Amino acid sequence: LQEALKDFEKRTGETMIQWSQFKGPPNPNVEYIPFDEMKNVMVVMNGVMFPINGPGTPRPLNRPNLQQNEEKNHHPDE
């Protein structure tokens, strides 16, 4: 990635913005949560806990085509 940025700077003469410029001081109002604890997020629906992105979470094999969904949900005007 660094090589690509350097190549871009050579070709265009423009300097790409470094990600470190976006990183500000940590917000004291936000509690830090380690990444390992974020791996297994649980959501409670109707009193039942569902893992969101933990192991054993079913993954969709393919996303339904948006156009097909529109055709299924289309109600003809009467």
Curated annotation (Swiss-Prot):
Gene Ontology BP terms: mRNA processing; regulation of double-strand break repair via homologous recombination; RNA splicing
Compositional bias per record (Basic and acidic residues), positions renumbered to this chain: 69-78
Assigned keywords, A-Z: Cytoplasm, Cytoskeleton, mRNA processing, mRNA splicing, Nucleus
GO function terms (MF aspect): protein phosphatase regulator activity
Gene Ontology annotations for the cellular component aspect, listed alphabetically: centrosome; cytoplasm; nucleus; protein phosphatase 4 complex
Main subcellular location of this protein, as a coarse class: cytoplasm
Region Disordered, annotated ranges: 53-78
Compartments (UniProt record): Cytoplasm, Cytoskeleton, Microtubule organizing center, Centrosome; Nucleus
Domain of life: Eukaryota
Family designation: Belongs to the PPP4R2 family.
Subunit structure: Serine/threonine-protein phosphatase 4 (PP4) occurs in different assemblies of the catalytic and one or more regulatory subunits. Component of the PP4 complexes PPP4C-PPP4R2, PPP4C-PPP4R2-PPP4R3A and PPP4C-PPP4R2-PPP4R3B. The PPP4C-PPP4R2 complex appears to be a tetramer composed of 2 molecules of PPP4C and 2 molecules of PPP4R2. Interacts with DDX20/GEMIN3 and GEMIN4. Interacts with RPA2; this DNA damage-dependent interaction recruits PPP4C leading to RPA2 dephosphorylation.
Main function: Regulatory subunit of serine/threonine-protein phosphatase 4 (PP4). May regulate the activity of PPP4C at centrosomal microtubule organizing centers. Its interaction with the SMN complex leads to enhance the temporal localization of snRNPs, suggesting a role of PPP4C in maturation of spliceosomal snRNPs. The PPP4C-PPP4R2-PPP4R3A PP4 complex specifically dephosphorylates H2AX phosphorylated on 'Ser-140' (gamma-H2AX) generated during DNA replication and required for DNA double strand break repair. Mediates RPA2 dephosphorylation by recruiting PPP4C to RPA2 in a DNA damage-dependent manner.
Protein name per Swiss-Prot or TrEMBL: Serine/threonine-protein phosphatase 4 regulatory subunit 2
The species this protein was found in: Oryctolagus cuniculus (Rabbit)
